[in-house]
Amino acid sequence: GFKSISKEFFSNRRSIIRFSPILKSENEILEEVVIKNDTKDAQGITTLKAEKIERIPGANSGIETLLMTLPGVSNNNELSTQYNVRGGNFDENLVYVNGIEIYRPFLVRSGQQEGLSFVNSTMVQNINFSAGGFQAKYGDKLSSVLDITYKKPLEFTATIKASLLGGSITVEDVFLDKKLSAIIGVRYRDNSLFVNSKQIETNFKPRFTDAQAFLSYKQSEKITLNFLGNFSLNKYDYQPVTRRTRFGTVTDPLELIVFYDGQEKDTYLTSFGALSADYQANDDLKLTATVTAFNTQEEEYFDIAASYNLGEVDANIGSQTFGDVTFSEGIGSQLNHSRNDLDALITNVQIRGTYKKDENQIDFGIKYQSENIKDRIREWEIIDSVGFSIRPLNLGFINDQPYNPFTGPIQPFQNIRAQNTLNISRFSGFFQYSKKGFIGEHKVWWNIGIRGHHWSVEANNNPIVHQFIVSPRAQFAMKPNWEKDILFRISGGVYSQPPFYKELRDFEGKILSNIKAQKSVHMVLGSDYSFTIWNRPFKLTTEVYYKNLSNINPYSVDNVRIRYQANNNAKGYATGMDIRLNGEFVPGNESWISLGILKTEENIDNRGYIARPSDQRFKLGILFQDYVPNLPDLKAYLNLVYNSGVPGGAPSYADPYNFQNRLRDYRRADLGVLYVFTDASKRFSTGFLSQFKELTAGLELFNMFDIQNSITNTWVRDAATKNQFGVPNYLSGRILNLKIGMKF
């Protein structure tokens, strides 16, 4: 446009006035234009920014740490990357990388054994997460979907990270006139810092290492070849020495002292490879064919003897023995032995397609999968209390020592011996239709789809068992043509989870081939309200949900180890509400507050409803980012989580109807302080910093309030009263970590 000119003239009659103005151009500064894609919101998918992963403090720095701050997602063990979603367990979550389903090791029983998550956060481009009500194109699990896309590099970049917990190197580049792109990452992790902060003195030598590669080659305008590979070697050498734990009340404190002998040596070797071909037939149709192989070889070997003394602590402040153990309530020992081996090979081939025409989209796919699992279990526990070997429960004999001698053989308190060979074949497919349009002036999205899954199980040369399920699913969303920016959505359907290896194996190690798929009839109502405060964007997301659960396979949880009854003898439900407010509480930095309310119960063998192991009634998560106003390169990050206690801590043999005690609430705050020397917004053309695309250094304070969290108990016996005491096994305390990041 041009600037306007206004000029007054005064003239006599018949005079001629010549005026030749030159208009000057004028630039009008428009307000910020925001282009929004509401498709993910309409699908109930939470999109997270990949760059946040690198800076959020957490014991496991990665995508899972970010997920724990979302409503409905919980984990009460900072050393584990596994998580529960809306009343589900760890095994009910789907994880995809570039459209390929990812599997985890099977034998891991504690968070400190896990090592690295499969997902290398430095290689991530996009993160999409759904806590329920997801579309038919995703697989057959009950709870959630985490859909990760790795980067396709555009130029050379090398990223190096190092801290007291380990380090990583990632290199990415393009070749062959940018037809070939490659990104390769190597990581190393050492959990010694966390394990040594516990109340158990140990000799601990963990070695968690993995290497990943993602290559993409554009053969032509229509054909692109991709390869995703992973190799992981986790070695866990653990030698406990002593333990001292005080617990109880102020007026009745107790102390447990344990002396250990023995060691544990575990090895988890996993390899994974996936080759895919994308074929862009035309502007409307895209086809993808993928071949995948996953192999895990796991060894869990340990012989650990423990001798303990449970004593009363003098709580009399005026006493000369104040704070000392004055009376022993229980003396005993136990020996734990394990020689467990597992070898699993999972291969599959699938074809997926997408057809788009105008505002219509059709997605379809078919998949065949073969699972071959060989498993050997040799695991037993002997408990001795004051010279008497404690026998297993409910063996139908009378032992009234010392009044009458008992001459029966010594038997382990727990004993599992099994050897299994398992072959599972699966055929699955899906078809779904999506459309965008209008109802009057209101924008709408809808999706309808169906999945089918057939599987056959052959265990230990027994007769093959065949089963088949169908899962219809649907979504509908509307964005009214209102002055306020609000989107409403509803989704639901039938979500079934066919049994995998762990669900088929009972407490005794026996494989039961006829276990049915667990089923959830799921309904989700949600809304997104986008608004502005302080001239900064905010969004309030609210969802309420209900799950009607049937064919439940009851389970118990010990740390991160899930043991199933291998019996579809329960029904249940899960209901709750999730609220998340995210926005720029500090200009230019997104933060959020999450609130989750949940209730989930189950009825086993019609004995009545009790809380499920994942019944976490309340969850609060806060992710806050800030910077120093006069020094904006100095940034602070706070990751705060509060989870109410869940039922747990019971002995492995306990009847859940007799043990509904809850563990203590999980409370944790991690603080990170980072200084950015240079990054994309602050580059140097000369000097030392000109060599870097990015250079950062910082400190992380984990569990900054040094709160004692516990997720399991050690059970010891009082010989005098025959009572058992649950001694909490505390997680990590306050830890300081130093880290540095470089990008070239």
Predicted regions and their residues:
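Face-selective signature of the C-terminal outer-membrane beta-barrel domain
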Residues: K218-L233, Q263-N460, T541-V544, W592
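Short acidic/polar hinge/loop motifs at secondary-structure boundaries
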Residues: R55, E101-F129
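Short, acidic, small-residue-rich periplasmic hinge/interaction motif at the N-terminus
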Residues: N12-N60, F90-E92, N98
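C-terminal beta-signal and adjacent terminal beta-strands/loops
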Residues: G588-S591, V641-P651, Y675-F744
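Membrane-embedded beta-barrel scaffold of Gram-negative outer-membrane proteins
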Residues: T288-T292, R489, A517-T575, A697-F702, ...
